[in-house]
Design a protein with these regions (language model features):
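Short, hydrophobic/amphipathic alpha-helical patches that form generic packing surfaces
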Residues: 3, 23-27, 54-61, 137-141
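Non-catalytic, well-ordered alpha-helical scaffold segments
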Residues: 18-22, 50, 54, 132-136, ...
Length: 178
């Protein structure tokens, strides 16, 4: 009490800032160990594997967001985001490139995030393009959305067969001229 001083008090009324609360909650979630996070997230995860649940930790500010983040990963029939597909359909050659890359994926063994990344990088180097130009099309074709969890571990978690099937199906929807 002796250290208390009225001079340093703010005279304005305090206010509740929901965005700041969400951000702060996200910081607490990110500070959890992976196992603590998985335990807290499990009720919101539709019985997803621990590996898939752990992918969501960096993106979550509230545990209630987990289900929405997981939906495109878990659902093979998840609808494709129109705005994201419109962005990639603007580049005519992207459909051919994603189809070629998908053919490389079909024979990739073992199916790991690291091998997926190497395959994408090698393909980009061969075509003399930046790896980033393939990331949005790959994400949209494999999950249906333009943003989400870290892509390589997500593709690993989805699995080779589901990933290649999704890409084949969506690239034909998005780039109808192929």
């Amino acid at each position: 009490i002796e250290l208390f001083d009225f001079e340093h008090l703010n005279k304005s009324n305090s206010r509740f800032d929901l965005d700041k609360c969400k951000w702060l909650n996200g910081q607490y979630i990110n500070d959890l160990t992976e196992q603590e996070y998985i335990e807290k997230a499990a009720p919101f995860s539709n019985n997803a594997s621990e590996k898939i649940i752990s992918l969501t930790q960096p993106r979550v500010q509230q545990l209630s967001e987990i289900e929405k983040i997981l939906k495109p990963i878990l659902d093979n029939e998840y609808p494709t985001d129109h705005d994201a597909s419109l962005k990639i359909s603007q580049t005519p050659e992207i459909g051919v490139m994603i189809k070629e890359l998908n053919q490389s994926f079909e024979s990739l063994d073992p199916w790991t995030a690291e091998n997926i990344k190497i395959t994408i990088k090698n393909y980009a180097d061969d075509k003399k393009i930046k790896i980033g130009s393939l990331m949005l099309p790959l994400r949209v074709c494999s999950t249906g959305v333009g943003q989400g969890t870290d892509l390589m571990p997500t593709l690993e978690a989805i699995g080779r067969n589901a990933t290649t099937t999704r890409i084949r199906s969506r690239i034909n929807q998005i780039c109808t001229d192929i």
